[in-house]
């Protein structure tokens, strides 16, 4: 019995030695091949080759273990023996059958969603290529669409850069308008400024991350701490975007639904929510990522740890949606007896925020359901990139450029500019008439803002909330 056990142990040890020997042979071949190109290979390429070698050697070791440990083919008839083709492991296959499996991820130009095929001939032997007369596996589909995918990736990259560039330009113009025209200053506009500034910062860090980190394989390979810090800042600022949107919803809800406390609003709480709270999920994600999924530069999206960031954002969007729907309910029931102009003024502000919430949140609704198939996946990528990277432009357009107050102020100052610099100097009568019309339109356009002025935190606020205090008195 002892002799039998010794024999079994020796046999097991022998199998292990055979596996190690085969791996050493392949490793030596890889090392010799890489040494021939050493003078021409850069450090990042060597690192990539090393990663590829490790993946192949691991797959080879597991394949040889599987070959020796699995029971023999027990079915009748001819079949092709299990084998390792150099990249993938193939089990026993009945004669006349074409076996297939996913493409490996060893190489950057290989698409793991495509299929590899290996044909077992009717004679029970693996297919041999007619040119080389050697057993052959069909890997051609793995990189058939590589050129198209590289082209798509470049298009998405430029689409992203252009989107954030347009967002930065439009947001800076909007901030310039809000800061230059002092009669627009009020608490609501202050919230707009912070929201816009968070989007500007997010767009800047995104462009830096894409151009200096994601597009720089050498930097990703070295995995410096600075690239992880940039990813941390990026995720933090992304959270700030959505929590400042929540601040917009809370402010409107407090102003309209809880109007009794409207004069007691303190912006400090909004600053803590908009700039402070997103630090919590960002820090938790950073710690969890470093412990459980510490990939290079934290750029991989193939981890559920991202829900640490996305979860609070989705919660903020849902809360905001509830606030805005409640605001609409209050406006419909409370403002029926007020003037139509005042009701419309409120509805415009609420409508702007109500439109933005689903538009900014749809990416997190669609994120888990990425479709399968090359064309469907490509369409999905384009739609998601537009929704994600043109948000700043969308926010600036809805909250500033389409804002009636902003348009009225710009139009008034433009008319004053034309009059001041003699746009109608060719006719004294026309200039006088134009000045009269401009003055009348100015008075009419500012009746709403100048009739009810509010002093909030020492600032004269010509804003729609002034109207609300007047309408509230009708219910008291």
Swiss-Prot record:
Keywords: Cell membrane, Disulfide bond, G-protein coupled receptor, Glycoprotein, Membrane, Receptor, Signal, Transducer, Transmembrane, Transmembrane helix
Signal sequence region: 1-33
Disulfide bridge map: 63-89, 80-120, 103-142
UniProt subcellular location: Cell membrane
Stored CDD domains: 7tmB1_calcitonin_R (cd15274)
Function in brief: May function as G protein-coupled receptor for calcitonin-gene-related peptides and adrenomedullin. Specificity may be modulated by accessory proteins. May activate cAMP-dependent pathway.
Protein name (Swiss-Prot/TrEMBL): Calcitonin gene-related peptide type 1 receptor
Lineage: Eukaryota, Metazoa, Chordata, Craniata, Vertebrata
